[in-house]
UniProtKB/Swiss-Prot annotation:
Pfam families: UPF0154 (PF03672). It comes from Ligilactobacillus salivarius (strain UCC118) (Lactobacillus salivarius). Signal peptide: none annotated. The keyword Cell membrane applies. The chain crosses the membrane at residues 5-25. InterPro entries: UPF0154. Disulfide bonds: none annotated. It is a single-pass membrane protein. Belongs to the UPF0154 family. This is UPF0154 protein LSL_0542.
Length: 74
């Protein structure tokens, strides 16, 4: 086989590797963030107290559900 064909095969393999790696990393991060959200109810409660709001359970659940729904749409 000629050198040109080998170069073409290497370039195609590299592009496929980059594309596959990108999608695998993206899927891994989405799953990781679903299992370990960057903010939880206790953090939300603390933020609301610091802002001078009384954190009711209903309000906390509404905010957490809104965040989960927002993340799922991306």
């Amino acid at each position: 086989m000629s050198t040109g064909i080998w170069v073409l095969i290497v370039i195609i393999a590299a592009v496929l590797g980059f594309v596959g790696g990108f999608f695998a990393a993206r899927k891994y991060m989405e799953d990781y963030l679903k299992k370990n959200p960057p903010i939880n109810e206790q953090m939300m409660r603390t933020m609301m107290i610091q802002m001078g709001q009384k954190p009711s359970e209903k309000k906390l659940h509404q905010m957490m559900n809104a965040m989960k729904n927002n993340y799922g749409k991306k």
